[in-house]
């Protein structure tokens, strides 16, 4: 039972049906009067994501102030079923019963997230969706998508095609990263992949149906080796010739954008323009961690920038860069978040 004119409740009903049909073989019709009721209330005591789940003899009622609460109530309901409910095939001989209960629940924290690093190890679009399913099952509501790093640039930027033509691919390696053989001369870069902007839109829609926000991370100014391989003019000294396989230690290969070059800020403007247009969330994560400043210390352009901006040291140069990224994102209607 639900308001069939509410598209969000209808979406949750379809989600619930998809979760139970494979294992049980039951087809549960969506009707105006049924034994499972999704009910929205004006009572704000449950908060935006809280719910009340009542399991009675022959009836199940989930009450919430917002559709997100109904969705989380469904997660609890699914967890009360026998574990065979997770099967993708019909399970015979299972007693599909739920114990009677009266549960009132709401989250303690508004931001409940997990990160997935798709740079060091490539995950396909379908694998990302499975990860989002796991977040939703545990009532997580933020997916932090670590899209770029030294070992691969995973997001299509249409104005900068080499980021994915070159930066998304490396030599195939497995094992402990510090024990990996470096890429050999002439070796093909066959490991990797990237998400087209259409792929991202599909993932965003999938996440929204599960009440999961998606926060993209573009890790700069450090952790930028893959970007420097694609666009070597953005390096302070000499950009690496190949995307990292993970065999180098911090500071060995140049992996930091040159903050002394105006071209770096033009590059970031192009990247963040497309990121801001693609991702609907108010936040964009720019990393900012583990920025090796030894390259800046030796770079005449970075030293000139420090002098021109009256910056005392390379730490202040990084702060200068971060502030410029914040202003850039603000101009695009976004807020900066970082490590």
Locate each region found by the language model:
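Active-site mouth loops of central-metabolism enzymes
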Residues: 113-127, 256-263
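Gly/Pro-rich turn-and-neighbor structural signature
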Residues: 265-339
């Amino acid at each position: 039972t639900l308001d069939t004119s509410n598209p969000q409740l209808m979406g949750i009903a379809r989600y619930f049906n998809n979760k139970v049909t494979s294992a049980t073989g039951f087809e549960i019709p969506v009707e105006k009067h049924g034994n499972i009721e999704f009910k929205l209330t004006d009572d704000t005591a449950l908060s935006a994501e809280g719910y009340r789940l009542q399991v009675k003899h022959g009836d199940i009622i989930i009450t919430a102030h917002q559709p997100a609460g109904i969705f989380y109530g469904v997660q609890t309901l699914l967890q009360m079923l026998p574990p065979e409910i997770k099967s993708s095939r019909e399970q015979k001989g299972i007693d599909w019963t739920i114990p009677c209960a009266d549960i009132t629940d709401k989250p303690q924290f508004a931001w409940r997230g997990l990160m997935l690093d798709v740079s060091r190890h490539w995950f396909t679009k379908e694998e990302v969706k499975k990860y989002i399913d796991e977040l939703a099952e545990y009532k997580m509501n933020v997916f932090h998508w670590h899209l770029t790093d030294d070992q691969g640039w995973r997001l299509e930027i249409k104005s900068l095609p080499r980021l994915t033509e070159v930066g998304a691919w490396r030599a195939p390696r497995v094992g402990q990263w510090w024990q990996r053989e470096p890429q050999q001369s002439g070796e093909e870069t066959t490991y990797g992949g990237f998400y087209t902007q259409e792929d991202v839109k599909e993932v965003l829609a999938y996440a929204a149906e599960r009440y999961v926000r998606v926060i993209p991370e573009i890790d700069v100014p450090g952790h930028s080796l893959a970007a420097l391989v694609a666009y070597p003019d953005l390096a302070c000294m000499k950009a690496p010739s190949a995307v990292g396989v993970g065999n180098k230690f911090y500071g060995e290969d140049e992996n930091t954008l040159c903050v002394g070059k105006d071209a770096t800020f033009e590059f970031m403007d192009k990247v963040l323009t497309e990121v801001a247009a693609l991702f609907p969330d108010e936040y964009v994560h720019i990393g900012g961690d583990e920025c090796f400043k030894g390259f800046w210390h030796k770079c005449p352009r970075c030293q000139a920038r420090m002098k021109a901006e009256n910056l005392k040291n390379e730490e202040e140069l990084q702060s200068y860069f971060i502030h410029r990224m914040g202003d850039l994102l603000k101009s695009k209607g976004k807020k900066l978040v970082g490590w």
